[in-house]
Amino acid sequence: MLAPDSVGRTFAGADSISITQSEIDAFAAVIGETDTTIAPPTFTIRISLDQFQNILTRPEVGLDWSRLVHGDQKFEIFSHVKAGDSLSCSATIESYRVAAGNEIVSVRSDLHRGEELVISSWSTLVVRA
């Protein structure tokens, strides 16, 4: 169960993430995108989910990742991601509730290129009862 004092906390990701053209090309091919001069908007969910797992499974946070399913996603894009970018990620646990025994957690992820905010994304994560 999520530790109640985790709500409202922001956690920094461990490392910067370097974006390669081959990663963009592979992701674009899977979703049928042909223009790979910039990363498709949903490309960054891979970064966010990796960071969420690292953050939310910390002992002081207490979420059981093995029972987690992804419920919803939205993005706010400020700048395009492209090959050669080095991005840092932070995640904020914005809300938490229990419904029918399931834990529902809303997490905002902010990706930065240096000091510039590139993308904010919000994920609703459900930890099954």
Give each language-model segment a name:
Residues M1-D72:
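Hot-dog-fold acyl-thioester-processing enzymes
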